Amino acid sequence: LTGDTGYLRKAIQAGRGQMTSTRMNEVYNYEMVSRDEGTDENNSIFHAVMFHWFTRMILDTEVDSFDGKIRKELYDYLYRHASYYWATIDKTPEGWPEAYFGVKCYQPRSSMNGDVGGSLGAYTSAAQAIESMWMIKDVKF
């Protein structure tokens, strides 16, 4: 990422901490997923930044010389979120125009259910997770 070994060690520690912290995550379907970012559009892009950063670490094979497991752990965590975002959003011709990504990766919103719009931060996070999966789809561990 930067070529600095001290930074890389801290980045690995921070990445693993994000994925395992009970303060930063909640359990859904027996899996750890990032907690609710909140509905404030000004404060809800943390996940998008985190997913981008995880993608950069997954693509950097030098990380393996410091920790042989972290890239796969990051990949699995990112894949889990992208899958929930993509699988739960209503992509039918009728539902798609009224569907919104929610602030939780597993709770989409829909004006058809009485929800009002969606957070721009939630959209950004969902888009980053889904786009990241295309960027790392060919990574081998």
Labelled PLM ranges:
Residues 1-2:
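Pocket-lining segment of extracytoplasmic ligand-binding domains
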Residues 6-8, 13-141:
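CBM-like carbohydrate-recognition segments
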